[in-house]
Curated annotation (Swiss-Prot):
This is Cytidylate kinase. It is found in: Cytoplasm. The keyword ATP-binding applies. It is an enzyme of class 2 (transferase). GO terms for cellular component: cytosol. Belongs to the cytidylate kinase family. Type 1 subfamily. It holds the Pfam family Cytidylate_kin. InterPro entries: Cytidylate_kin (IPR003136), Cytidylate_kinase_dom (IPR011994), P-loop_NTPase (IPR027417). One of its GO terms (biological process) is nucleobase-containing small molecule interconversion. It catalyses: CMP + ATP = CDP + ADP; dCMP + ATP = dCDP + ADP. It comes from Blochmanniella floridana. ATP binds at G15, P16, S17, G18, S19, G20, K21, G22, V23.
Length: 232
């Protein structure tokens, strides 16, 4: 793959909770040999750090200061991306719906988003970047060479989240989980600052009736059309 003007190539993968964007982004980063940015994990880490430090979740200034002290990295170790915060591996579970809802609420604060916007853009380094989030293609990297928006029916997304949480021994009620996902969708899609919407030039992919491999193959085909041959 050849790129002009020394511009770092970026693939953005946006979508709601449970759409499969995290799995797809990690696989694309591995196949392409590029760096990974999972913006949702950064928000979740910020929420957990705020809880651990007894910081008021409604205190925007305190959250902004806390975020400025956090350094997150995604390291590919044996074909699996491991998350580090301030050079320490994140071992506690940050993928619960409780933490996810806190992260979604934190994302409403303009000052926090401003700090995160600048920080997320520091991940844009060669050989390339796969950025996973909700506003990667619209706000953070609007000039990305490839933009993908992944979605799925709420029931399917809720079941995926249920399966994911049960694997790490979390007991969750399906109806409650579905309700939480709908609530989060509403908050993410209707917020005034960086709402969850597909970029106008995004490849919109509905994964409701697709397997992980089918989603991956469709995404790779789209990337090939945009940037050239990929060996995988």
């Amino acid at each position: 793959m050849k790129f002009i003007n020394n511009i770092v190539p970026i693939v953005t993968v946006d979508g709601p909770s449970g759409s499969g964007k995290g799995v797809l982004s990690k696989q694309l980063a591995y196949i392409l040999g590029w760096n990974l940015l999972d913006s949702g994990i950064i928000y979740r880490i910020l929420a957990c750090e705020a809880l651990d430090n007894n910081i008021d979740m409604c205190n925007e200034d305190s959250l902004q200061v806390l975020m400025s002290k956090i350094k997150v990295s995604f390291i590919n170790i044996k074909n699996s991306f491991v998350v580090y915060c301030n050079d320490k591996e994140i071992k506690k579970n940050i993928h619960t719906e409780f933490v996810g809802n806190l992260a979604s609420k934190i994302a409403l604060f303009p000052k926090v988003r401003d700090v995160l916007l600048k920080y997320q853009r520091t991940f844009c380094v060669f050989p390339g970047l796969v950025a996973d989030g909700r506003d990667m293609g619209t706000i953070v990297f609007p000039n990305a060479i490839v933009k993908i928006f992944l979605n799925a029916a709420v029931k399917v997304r809720a079941q995926r989240r249920l399966d994911q949480l049960q694997k790490v021994n979390f007991s969750v009620n399906f109806k409650c989980l579905s309700s939480q996902i709908k609530e989060r969708d509403d908050r993410d899609c209707n917020r005034q600052l960086a709402p969850l919407v597909p970029a106008v030039d995004a490849f919109v992919l509905d994964s409701t009736h697709l397997s992980k491999n089918e989603v991956e193959n469709k995404a790779l085909l789209f990337i090939q059309k945009k940037i050239g041959i990929i060996n995988y």
